Amino acid sequence: YTLRYLDKLEDEIKSRYKGELVDTIYIGGGTPSSLSLLELRRLFDIIKIFKLKDKYEATIECNIEDICIDKLKLFKDNNINRLSIGVESFDKDNLSYLSKSTLIL
């Protein structure tokens, strides 16, 4: 379903985007880092529709459990220059209740 959603997202952007210069790309909401490499590549292809200013910020929200070397390389290759890594809690009991793994810092 995700690839079909991305196809519809591309259709929507193409129908509404008028070519304005963009200074911020924010990929977030629903933890996009949980997408597969194939899905992320498709998303980055869609984002290339936008015309970016010379200086821009490109952010992607990440769940620490979803980050791997391949995804970090993909982010870098697609000019993501900021990661937003959310923290649900530093309390072990809260993490257990939320069914999240514990991150030792």
Describe each model-derived feature in a short phrase:
Residues Y1-L105:
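Conserved non-cysteine loop/helix-boundary elements of the Radical SAM core domain that shape
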